[in-house]
């Protein structure tokens, strides 16, 4: 399971203030990660209901790495999957904000044909992904 995380550079948060509610994002710079045609709305959950916050991104990219690097440079808040930001979070280069408002984690599935003739490459990939899933895709 993995989920979307809103995060930013700790120094950025110190300078601009840490948002305590989804609506507080309106006063922050945002970095939009996703398809270029994706909605600028960021979705959260508050008291069991979905809350949408429309952002005017400072930077739009379809690369998680670019969004993370820009956030690490102080560009603002970004939303990426937990596993994509795991290294930056672990090293303290980014910090999660609004965690209690994030949507539930998304399940990750590996789909492959059941067969005694499963290729060695597929078997190795399955073993690799399931072996690192707790570290790489762990829940908050």
Regions found by a protein language model. Give the residues of each.
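A ligand-binding cleft/hinge motif common to bilobed small-molecule-binding domains
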Residues: 68-93
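Short helix-loop capping/hinge motifs at secondary-structure junctions, enriched
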Residues: 12-20, 116-120
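Ligand-binding cleft/hinge of the Venus flytrap
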Residues: 41-54
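Short loop->beta-strand "edge-of-pocket" segments that line small-molecule binding or catalytic clefts
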Residues: 22-44
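Short, small-residue-biased leader/transition segments that mark boundaries at the very start
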Residues: 1-9
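Short beta-strand-to-loop elements that line the ligand-binding cleft
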Residues: 32, 53-63, 101
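C-terminal effector-binding regulatory domain of bacterial HTH transcription factors
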Residues: 82-91, 100-140
């Amino acid at each position: 399971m993995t989920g979307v995380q809103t995060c930013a550079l700790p120094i950025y948060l110190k300078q601009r203030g840490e948002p305590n509610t989804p609506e507080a994002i309106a006063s922050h710079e945002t970095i939009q990660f996703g398809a270029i045609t994706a909605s600028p709305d960021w979705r959260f959950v508050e008291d069991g209901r979905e809350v949408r916050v429309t952002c005017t991104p400072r930077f739009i990219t379809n690369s998680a790495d670019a969004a993370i690097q820009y956030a690490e440079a102080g560009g603002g808040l970004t939303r990426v999957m937990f596993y994509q930001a795991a290294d930056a979070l672990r090293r303290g280069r980014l910090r999660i904000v609004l965690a209690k408002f994030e949507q539930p984690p998304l399940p990750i599935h590996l789909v492959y044909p059941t067969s005694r003739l499963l290729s060695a490459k597929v078997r190795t990939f399955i073993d690799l992904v399931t072996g690192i899933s707790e570290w790489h895709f762990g829940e908050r």
